[in-house]
């Protein structure tokens, strides 16, 4: 699940998009509300992804059409989504403990335990999302989006509408994050209006860890780095919890990891200069 979320963040973190802190719980809120009302949990996942997509479009319009700075556009959407999420759920949280989810239905269908289903479902979703991303960003449209991220002025000089490319990139990334929120809500057994707090830090930690370890010299390497970084991050979190770290300190620990990873190149450069 974190791999899918990180893949979305990997597409947007260089554009300073804060929408994820709102689109993640939006996906969970939509999915939980639909499931509680008797809808299919699989349909609820699609609806959660669509909700994230709409959130990304809003941020994209604020940034490209209204010329609001990227980070502020994301923050404004994130703040607005807090109220939207409350309206979607009708309250601060929704329990899913006594209803069918994608995990319980998969366990029943394949005659496996819930723990096995909790591994299989995210693994399949990760594969499908990664395959789609690899294919899409290899198309002409996808390469235009990637080029816009690298050098907006150069792409604009080629006659490409960069505003449209940015909006498409934002709604794809936030659709992935909304999908992840829908899956996490079903796995946790509840959706909460505050479940998105710290999402961007967790995702960034996964992306940065993967990039530091593998390096990024191609698009496929970038995909692999995100997946590897997510796995390593979760292993590290499991280890520090096993060693006795209070769960309340996890966000602080994650923030420190991100700071160290971002500062490492500068520190390394100063050390080399000193030598």
Range-by-range predicted roles:
Residues 1, 37-43, 105, 111, ...:
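Membrane-interfacial amphipathic/re-entrant helices at transmembrane-helix boundaries
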Residues 2-9, 13:
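Single conserved hydrophobic/aromatic residue that forms the stacking wall/gate
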Residues 22, 42-50, 72, 119-124, ...:
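Hydrophobic alpha-helical transmembrane segments
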Residues 39-79, 126-127, 228-229, 233:
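Alpha-helical transmembrane segments within multi-pass membrane transporters and channels
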Residues 55, 114-192, 200:
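Helix-loop-helix "hairpin" substructures at the membrane interface of multi-pass membrane proteins
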Residues 70, 74, 81-138, 168, ...:
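Transmembrane helix-bundle core of multi-pass membrane transporters
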Residues 150-157, 161-164, 217, 236-275:
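Cytosolic-side transmembrane-helix boundaries in multi-pass membrane proteins
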Residues 177-252:
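Transmembrane alpha-helical segments in multi-pass inner-membrane proteins
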């Amino acid at each position: 699940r974190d791999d899918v979320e990180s893949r979305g963040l990997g597409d947007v973190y260089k554009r300073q998009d804060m929408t994820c802190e709102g689109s993640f719980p939006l996906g969970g809120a939509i999915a939980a509300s639909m499931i509680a009302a008797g809808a299919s949990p699989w349909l609820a996942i699609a609806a959660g992804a669509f909700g994230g997509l709409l959130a990304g479009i809003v941020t994209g319009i604020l940034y490209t059409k209204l010329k609001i700075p990227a980070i502020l556009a994301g923050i404004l959407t994130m703040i607005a989504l807090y109220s939207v999420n409350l309206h979607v759920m009708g309250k601060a949280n929704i329990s899913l403990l006594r209803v069918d989810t994608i995990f319980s239905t998969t366990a029943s269908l394949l005659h496996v335990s819930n723990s096995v289903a909790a591994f299989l479902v995210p693994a399949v979703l990760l594969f499908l999302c990664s395959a789609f991303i690899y294919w899409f960003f290899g198309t002409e449209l996808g390469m235009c989006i990637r080029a816009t991220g690298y050098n907006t002025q150069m792409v604009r000089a080629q006659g490409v509408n960069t505003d449209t490319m940015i909006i498409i990139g934002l709604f794809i990334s936030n659709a992935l994050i909304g999908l992840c929120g829908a899956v996490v809500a079903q796995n946790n057994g509840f959706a909460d209006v505050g479940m998105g707090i710290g999402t961007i830090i967790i995702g960034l930690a996964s992306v940065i860890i993967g990039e530091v370890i593998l390096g990024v010299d191609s698009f496929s390497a970038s995909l692999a780095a995100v997946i590897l970084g997510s796995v390593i991050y979760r292993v590290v979190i499991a280890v520090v919890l096993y060693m006795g770290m209070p769960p309340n300190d996890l966000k602080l620990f994650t923030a420190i990891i991100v700071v160290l990873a971002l500062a490492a190149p500068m520190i390394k450069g100063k050390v080399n200069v000193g030598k």
